[in-house]
């Protein structure tokens, strides 16, 4: 593949165009009066969405330099989404603004390294100020507000708050499709742990990037699975029962993993392999817990249960299993209530009898996992497109609510950022030269989210920004009512964690773009000349 190399101005201009293309597509969705964007997929029906990261993921530009810019900003959206699960549109706009102003200054001869020093210092200052402004979120009403702002749907807000109340703020809340047009909350028995799939080829739902298995055979293996001849017989048992299979083992490597991946790609078998969490005794104990919850038998040569001799009787099962890149959730395991209760009693005895604080803490964690429910929000709607759009909104709302419970909230609508921007300008006076210009570039960028929220509501963005900057902490512009007031009381709030991830990720990508002296990209292949007969191009 040929490479194209562009230097300085040319590289930066292409990148800037791409940054703008992506940010402008996302920008229109911001705020309560933001619009939806229709995404035409290569296959399947078009999606209608106002979720920044969903839009960002779909954008690919034909010009390679512009595409580089778009992909850089896309990475900001995706990173912010990974950390906080929301706030991607804000992050994208901040990145666009810092990049635009930064590049303008670089073109005029500013030193990119100095600009970056200012941007980095400014970013730290802003995060500190966001934390100072944080209001703790404790009540269900607060959580409902956060979730309502995120999803633009009070019904969703109430369901998320109810779910978090049932399972605690560290509890598991998942989203499923409901079988009817109604949406409702269901709390079931479930166990989750922090290990995800060993290969992205196991993903079954590309929209959410999850692997979902309904009523799978669950195979628990104490050691590594590395020999294919030992592993195949068990795999065939799952195939015979025509069930998907979830494998939890110390590790799955080599040929067995390749076999699972190839079969997943060919769709001959739905399989997901996950590493067992923890180490040593703790891993052993947790695996035994899982065996009780799912009704499985742990494969363990030490007690004479060998992989190559195992039949279908070693499988456990559950109503469904959802695996993400870093978490596994087993809902409604098939283990009997009696067996699970006995297991809990046993762990309680361990807690009473141990002298080690660490052991006690770990045993309490296991007990919590075994007793903890999983809240399932069932999302219903009239059409397939509508269901998938609502599911995304509900997931954003859950993430926003969890982030709020962790780090508190600030006034929404970008207001806190506008007000911090004023303090940042004062902070800029401590710098000189290009570093100062960098701090000021960030200060200008912080006004952009409010500017576009107002603009989307049909008002003059600049006027709204200047008004908001004069208001005290907690007050700002409400784009739904078009009035200024105490946003925290009105429930227009953003989680600090979401906003601070947006600032950190946006500034880090902007700094990367500003120090780009050259960019090397793949040169697009020239279209083949047509001969007398038609070629079919396969992409």
UniProtKB/Swiss-Prot annotation:
Domain of life: Bacteria
Annotated positions binding ATP: 29-32, 86-90, 413, 478-480, 494
Protein name: Chaperonin GroEL 1
PANTHER family named among the record's database cross-references: 60 KDA HEAT SHOCK PROTEIN, MITOCHONDRIAL (PTHR45633)
Keywords, sorted A to Z: ATP-binding, Chaperone, Cytoplasm, Isomerase, Nucleotide-binding
The protein's role, per its UniProt record: Together with its co-chaperonin GroES, plays an essential role in assisting protein folding. The GroEL-GroES system forms a nano-cage that allows encapsulation of the non-native substrate proteins and provides a physical environment optimized to promote and accelerate protein folding.
Similarity comment: family membership: Belongs to the chaperonin (HSP60) family.
GO cellular component: cytoplasm
UniProt-listed Enzyme Commission number(s): 5.6.1.7
Molecular function via GO: ATP binding; ATP-dependent protein folding chaperone; isomerase activity; unfolded protein binding
PROSITE patterns: CHAPERONINS_CPN60
Xref: Gene3D superfamilies: GroEL, GroEL-like equatorial domain, TCP-1-like chaperonin intermediate domain
NCBIfam families, sorted: GroEL, PRK00013.1, PRK12849.1, PRK12850.1, PRK12851.1
InterPro entries: Chaperonin_Cpn60_CS, Cpn60/GroEL, Cpn60/GroEL/TCP-1, GroEL-like_apical_dom_sf, GROEL-like_equatorial_sf, TCP-1-like_intermed_sf
Catalytic activity reported: ATP + H2O + a folded polypeptide = ADP + phosphate + an unfolded polypeptide
Record's subcellular location: Cytoplasm
One record GO biological process: protein refolding
Organism taxonomic ancestry: Bacteria, Bacillati, Actinomycetota, Actinomycetes, Mycobacteriales
Subunit structure: Forms a cylinder of 14 subunits composed of two heptameric rings stacked back-to-back. Interacts with the co-chaperonin GroES.
Enzyme class: isomerase
């Amino acid at each position: 593949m040929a490479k194209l190399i562009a230097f300085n101005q040319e590289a930066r201009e292409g990148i800037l165009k791409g940054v703008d293309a992506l940010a402008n597509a996302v920008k229109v969705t911001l705020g309560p009066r933001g619009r939806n964007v229709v995404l035409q997929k290569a296959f399947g029906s078009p999606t209608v969405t106002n979720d920044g990261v969903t839009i960002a993921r779909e954008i690919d530009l034909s010009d390679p330099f512009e595409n580089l810019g778009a992909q850089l900003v896309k990475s900001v959206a995706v990173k912010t989404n990974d950390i906080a699960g929301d706030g991607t549109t804000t992050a994208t706009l901040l990145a666009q603004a810092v990049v635009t102003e930064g590049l303008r200054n670089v073109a005029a001869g500013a030193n990119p390294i100095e600009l970056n020093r200012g941007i980095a210092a400014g970013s730290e200052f802003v995060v500190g100020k966001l934390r100072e402004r944080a209001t703790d979120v404790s009540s269900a009403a607060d959580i409902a507000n956060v979730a309502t702002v995120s999803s633009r749907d009070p019904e969703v807000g109430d369901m998320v708050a109810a779910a978090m109340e049932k399972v605690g703020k560290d509890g598991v809340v998942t989203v499923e499709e409901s079988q009817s047009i109604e949406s409702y909350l269901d709390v079931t028995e479930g166990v989750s742990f922090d290990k995800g799939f060993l290969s992205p080829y196991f993903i079954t739902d590309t929209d959410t990037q999850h692997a979902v298995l309904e009523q799978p055979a669950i195979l628990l293996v104490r050691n590594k699975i590395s020999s294919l001849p030992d592993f195949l017989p068990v795999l065939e048992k799952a195939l015979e029962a025509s069930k998907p299979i979830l494998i939890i083992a110390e590790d799955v490597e080599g040929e067995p993993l390749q076999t699972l991946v190839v079969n997943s790609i060919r769709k001959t078998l739905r399989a997901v392999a996950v590493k067992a969490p923890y180490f040593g005794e703790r891993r052993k104990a947790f695996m035994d817990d899982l065996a009780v919850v799912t009704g499985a038998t742990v494969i363990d040569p030490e007690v004479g249960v060998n992989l190559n001799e195992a039949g279908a009787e070693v499988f456990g099962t559950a109503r469904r299993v959802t695996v993400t890149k870093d978490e596994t959730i087993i809902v409604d395991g098939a283990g009997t209530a009696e067996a699970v209760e006995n297991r809990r009693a046993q762990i309680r005895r361990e807690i009473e009898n141990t002298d080690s604080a660490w052991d006690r803490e770990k045993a309490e964690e296991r007990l919590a996992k075994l007793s903890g429910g999983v809240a399932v929000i069932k999302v219903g709607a009239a059409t397939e497109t509508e269901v998938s759009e609502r599911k995304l909104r509900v997931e954003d709302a859950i993430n926003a609510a969890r982030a709020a419970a962790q780090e508190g909230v600030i006034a929404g609508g970008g207001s806190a950022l506008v007000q911090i921007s004023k303090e940042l300008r004062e902070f800029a006076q401590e710098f000189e030269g290009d570093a100062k210009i960098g701090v000021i570039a960030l200060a200008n960028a912080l006004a952009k989210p409010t500017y576009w929220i107002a603009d989307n509501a049909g008002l003059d963005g600049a006027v709204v920004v200047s008004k908001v900057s004069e208001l005290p902490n907690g007050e700002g512009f409400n784009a739904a009512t078009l009035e200024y007031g105490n946003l925290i009381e009105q429930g227009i709030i953003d989680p600090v964690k979401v906003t601070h991830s947006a600032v950190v990720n946006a500034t880090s990508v902007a700094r990367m773009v500003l120090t780009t002296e050259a960019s090397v990209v793949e040169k697009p292949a020239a279209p083949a000349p047509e001969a007398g007969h038609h070629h079919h191009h396969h992409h």
